[in-house]
């Protein structure tokens, strides 16, 4: 074998090893690529009791009930399906009915999602009070930070999204 042939064999071998490694990584990550499952996905996939996953959706208005101590129950919906959730702990400050939520836990045998962690989602206009105060103090605050963006039904032009001068 000449030097050129050996070099080509090494490059080819390294390429094969790289392809196999990428394939193994992608295969291992196949089940965990989705950040959360919606209630509709939970019903369609028939997830077995005890298997941990993340459930995401909107807290159904009127479904929040508080029990003894820190126990709460609510329903998470995606518009097509609903999953009852039970949680014992302190809820995040942004947690509200009609607000987005992601809960981590597992289904029990009765089909109730037993969450051990609840995360409240917020829209893109949310800004922590500390950050807003710091921006105001430094003189970088703009009045349009407090304005809501146009809703999904409103036509938003490029001019409407441009900061006021």
Curated annotation (Swiss-Prot):
Residues exposed to the Cytoplasmic side: 1-7
Matching InterPro entries: CcmE (IPR004329), CcmE-like_sf (IPR036127), NA-bd_OB-fold (IPR012340)
Biased composition (Basic and acidic residues): 138-149
Annotated GO biological process: cytochrome complex assembly
Transmembrane region(s): 8-28
GO-annotated cellular components: plasma membrane
Region (Disordered): 138-165
Record topology, Periplasmic segments: 29-165
Binding positions (heme): 122, 126
Signal sequence residues: none
GO molecular function ontology, one term from the record: metal ion binding
Residue spans of biased composition, Low complexity class: 153-165
Primary location group: membrane
UniProt keyword annotation of Protein biosynthesis present: no
Keyword annotations: Cell inner membrane, Cell membrane, Cytochrome c-type biogenesis, Heme, Iron, Membrane, Metal-binding, Signal-anchor, Transmembrane, Transmembrane helix
Domain of life: Bacteria
Topology of this chain in the membrane: Single-pass type II membrane protein
Compartments (UniProt record): Cell inner membrane
Function: Heme chaperone required for the biogenesis of c-type cytochromes. Transiently binds heme delivered by CcmC and transfers the heme to apo-cytochromes in a process facilitated by CcmF and CcmH.
UniProt family annotation: Belongs to the CcmE/CycJ family.
Protein name from the UniProt record: Cytochrome c-type biogenesis protein CcmE
Protein source organism: Rhodopseudomonas palustris (strain HaA2)
